[in-house]
Regions:
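Bacterial N-terminal signal peptides that target proteins for export
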Residues: 1-13
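Hydrophobic helical h-region of N-terminal Sec-dependent signal peptides
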Residues: 14-18
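Sec/Tat signal peptide C-region and signal peptidase I cleavage site
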Residues: 20-27
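N-terminal secretory/targeting leader peptides
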Residues: 27-118, 125-129, 133-328
Length: 328
């Protein structure tokens, strides 16, 4: 079944539930923490998903989004959902690779560097990841990729040697390890704190998408963005499994249908947002373009090291994902 067909069926499911007046036992409100700003496309898709569920259940289940880390900081969201502090939320799961190496499958440098390859990798990993999350009291609803990750600096960089000693914003194990290999100093900084970190000199560089740089107006502190297309990490919307199991079938169907639509819309927006945000970085004075051949070769060598390390940490489960990806 094609993605467009799946989306159509999902929309019909949601529409049918609205027409039938899908009902839950009692009206509920679920708060949905999100780490990124309200203007970020992930947050916009999340808000539309929330509205879809609210409408699809006839208001019996209202989901209220809280973007920008306003309810829980990014690093706290997964635990908040697991423990039932909230019933739903969005999180970048690669930030939890220290819990289980599989969470970092989408941040293996230079494995999947395009949207098409990212989709193939997600197809290979979705089953094992869903099972892993279920074991942590989490039910996966949908996942949306970021645009490809590039390198931001406050200066021109032509080789890894020039990165030595630079303070580098990290957001997961992969970014911290990349910094270490390049001789940079990793500093853990959540998305909501990026602008302040660069303005105050806490960080001088990062690897992220054009989307994050645009949302945080990093041109106020940084000067260069290198398109290295290292990986396309994903944000995941998850529900507390006990809360999910407590919903009636009709409400679950609405949420599943809205999730399919959200993932489809998120994929499309991520693709469209890529060129737009890179153009905006350039319009605001940043130097934007591919990294030089020498720097690219050095970074890919780091990628080979990090791939081997990830496979060692993830074991047979990780190898199965890579094998399934390569088979496609």
């Amino acid at each position: 079944m094609t993605k467009s067909m799946t989306k159509t069926i999902a929309m019909m499911t949601v529409s049918g539930c609205v027409a039938l007046g899908a009902t839950a036992v009692a009206a509920e409100t679920w708060d949905m923490p999100m780490a990124y700003s309200a203007t970020n496309f992930h947050s916009a898709v999340g808000a539309e998903f929330a509205s879809c569920v609210t409408a699809g259940t006839g208001g019996d289940l209202e989901i209220v989004t809280h973007p920008g880390g306003s309810l829980f900081a990014g690093g706290e969201i997964k635990r908040a959902i697991q423990s039932g502090q909230v019933n739903i939320g969005e999180r970048l799961l690669s930030g939890h690779q220290n819990e289980n190496a599989l969470f970092g499958f989408d941040s293996i440098p230079f494995l999947a560097t395009s949207f098409d390859d990212s989709e193939k990798l997600w197809d290979a990993a979705k089953g094992p990841l869903t099972e892993l999350l279920a074991g942590q009291n989490l039910h996966l609803l949908y996942a949306v990729p970021w645009p490809a990750q590039g390198l931001y600096f406050d200066r021109e960089i032509n080789s890894v040697a020039e990165m030595d000693g630079i303070k580098f914003r990290s957001y997961n194990n992969a970014t911290a390890r990349l910094a270490e290999l390049a001789g940079m100093l990793p500093v853990q900084i959540e998305a909501a704190e990026i602008s302040q970190a660069f303005a105050t000199g806490v960080a001088e560089s990062m690897i992220s998408s054009g989307s994050t740089g645009y949302d945080r107006k990093v041109w106020e502190s940084l000067t260069h963005f290198y398109e290295v297309d290292a990986w396309l990490p994903r944000n995941y919307v998850m529900v507390n499994l006990e809360a999910w199991n407590g919903l009636d079938e009709s409400t679950q169907n609405v949420m599943e249908g809205c999730s399919i639509v959200a993932e489809y819309a998120g994929d499309w927006r991520s693709i469209q947002y890529t060129d737009f945000t890179l153009n905006e970085l350039a319009k605001n004075g940043m130097t934007v373009g591919p990294a030089g051949e020498s720097l690219t070769a050095e970074l890919k060598a780091f990628g080979e090291i990090m791939t081997s390390e990830w496979l060692e940490a993830s074991g047979d489960a990780g190898q199965a994902i890579i094998d399934a990806f390569n088979a496609n």
